[in-house]
Amino acid sequence: STNPETITEIRRKMNFEEVKRIVKRVQEKGNVHQHLDLIAGLPYEDYERFAQSFRDVYALHPEQLQLGFLKVLKGSYMHEKTEDYQLLYQDRPPFEVLSTKWLSYDDVIRLKGVEEMVEVYYNSGQFVNTLRLLEEEFTDTFALYESLSRYYEENGLHMINHSRITRYEVLFAFIKACVEKNVENYRQMLILDLYLRENVKKRPEFAGEVSVDKQKASAFYEKEAEERRYLKGYEGYDKRQLRKMTHLEQINGNLYVFDYRNRNVLTNQASVFWVEGGDEAYPSGHPTHACGGQTSSDHV
């Protein structure tokens, strides 16, 4: 929680500004996978105040944002305060809170839905660029995941184990239902996110037909096999092997090559290079490299 009254009550005093400073300092090193946790059901934190804690912590952009629910264990301080806090909780493991003086059972269920959406779309790290755009469409980041959860429920999509590709398709359907402008740009970002993670051979429906024709792809790989300009570490492979091991995609009018042998150590995303334009695009002779796979929409 980032609520001063809450953290004082649970005897976990902290200076959130100092926490922010430390988190950002660790992020600057670029070599640590950060997990930040939020617990629902704490004293003095109702639904709206929890949403504020969510916004505060989400703004730090950890690799994982874990939403948990208070566990009322015998012998703990929370157990001692059961009556004061009007705690209702499960009578068997994991003894999770069901409602409190500040948080109704319906609120807990709503937060469970938000938790699932954060886990699927944020913590998976598979929708980075699409989410970055979506965050701008909503009043705040909590509202985004709240809306996603509501969309799942209203369309009978919750309580189902969806495939990875289906998660992309559902997100695109959500975007088309909620976003008035730039839907095509969102589609392009979904394609980018899709191929950053995996060299998908069977394109999902939302991705449409192959965006790079065979002649253009053949010309690129033939030249790359001779010059080795973009793909490093592939020296022992010919043009046909390069084509199988990497991926070419046309995104927002630009050509990109996805390198799956060289991935970001934190995100596991492929490295990606902008190759459209050849020498004219890179007067210095060095191709643009999008941060080891941390490609943002600004690059595309």
What kind of region is each of these model predictions?
Residues 57-64, 68-162:
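Contiguous mid-protein beta-loop-alpha structural module that forms a pocket-lining wall or clamp
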Residues 2, 14, 45, 103-106, ...:
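Short coil/turn linker and secondary-structure boundary residues
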Residues 116-300:
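Radical SAM enzyme core and accessory elements
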Residues 1-92, 98-99:
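Conserved non-cysteine loop/helix-boundary elements of the Radical SAM core domain that shape
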Residues 5, 17, 21, 48, ...:
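Generic alpha-helical secondary structure signal
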